[in-house]
């Protein structure tokens, strides 16, 4: 069963706003990389498609159990609606670490300190079974970059200590090794009808940390529309 939930939902043990009956639903997870859902939904006569909205959360079974994915893009055609959603983990893209530095610490101590440095609190938990002692710093970046990096040496928890990330809704674990399937596919019957919107909020920013050419940081600036979103989108 695939369900859809309000933007602010943090528990997914009910049907939320209701169920969806997509023509297809594909979940793809890359090791220490992208974790996304693509869903195609018909314009069903029961109006289930009307529950689809930017920021709402789709919950579906995966090889790792029931997982939540937040909608960031909707593309309608005459036949159906294509929906793109990221695992709820990627809510962390919209948070921000201004400056975090620690001396010698264990991976768990570093994760705890990094979470305390977020621009605003989140429901996420961070656990690891990695060992070792090291210094670590992260500044002017989002938590996803601090955790996974961008491929440069020692720019993230993963590149510093190794390990593989396991994303279980709001529970994030970095382990020595995790088993995983590369993709998951669901197909349902189709019943096509009408037409609607085209939205994409993947590049929206509602809070800015200005940094001058000399590296000096100014006062944060909030958009007048910041309250239209479920949490600040920081850059």
What is each of the regions a protein language model found here?
Residues 36-41, 79-87, 171-174:
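A generic structural motif
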Residues 18, 30, 38-39, 85, ...:
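Amphipathic, non-transmembrane alpha-helical segments in extracytoplasmic/periplasmic proteins
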Residues 35, 67, 79-81, 168-170, ...:
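Envelope-exposed proteins and targeting segments
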Residues 21-24, 29, 173-175, 189-191, ...:
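Catalytic phosphate/metal-binding cores of nucleic-acid and nucleotide-processing enzymes, i.e., regions
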Residues 1-50, 88-90, 235:
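Juxtamembrane "anchor/assembly" segments of surface/extracellular structural proteins
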Residues 10-14, 45-50, 65-68, 90-94, ...:
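Short, surface-exposed beta-strand/loop "edge" segments at domain boundaries and coil↔beta transitions
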Residues 46-130:
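Surface-exposed cap/loop segments at beta↔alpha junctions
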Residues 181-235:
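Acidic, small/polar-enriched beta strand-loop surface segments
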């Amino acid at each position: 069963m695939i369900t859809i939930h309000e933007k602010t939902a943090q528990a997914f043990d009910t049907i939320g706003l209701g169920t969806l009956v997509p023509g297809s639903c594909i979940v793809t997870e890359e090791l220490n990389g992208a974790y996304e859902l693509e869903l195609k939904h018909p314009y069903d006569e029961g109006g289930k498609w009307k529950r689809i909205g930017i920021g709402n959360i789709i919950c579906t079974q995966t090889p790792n159990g029931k997982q939540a994915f937040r909608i960031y893009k909707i593309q309608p055609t005459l036949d159906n609606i294509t929906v793109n959603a990221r695992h709820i983990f990627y809510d962390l893209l919209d948070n921000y670490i201004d400056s975090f530095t620690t001396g010698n610490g264990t991976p768990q101590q570093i994760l705890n300190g990094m979470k305390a440095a977020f621009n605003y609190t989140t429901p996420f938990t961070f656990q690891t079974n990695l060992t070792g002692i090291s210094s670590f710093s992260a500044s002017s970046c989002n938590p996803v970059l601090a955790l996974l990096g961008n491929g440069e040496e020692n720019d993230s928890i993963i590149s510093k200590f190794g390990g593989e990330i396991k994303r279980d809704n709001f529970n994030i674990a970095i382990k020595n090794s995790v088993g995983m399937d590369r993709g998951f596919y669901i197909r349902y019957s189709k019943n096509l009808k009408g037409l609607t919107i085209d939205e994409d909020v993947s590049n929206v920013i509602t809070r800015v940390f200005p940094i001058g050419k000399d590296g000096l940081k100014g006062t944060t600036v909030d958009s007048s529309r910041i309250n239209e979103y479920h949490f600040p989108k920081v850059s």
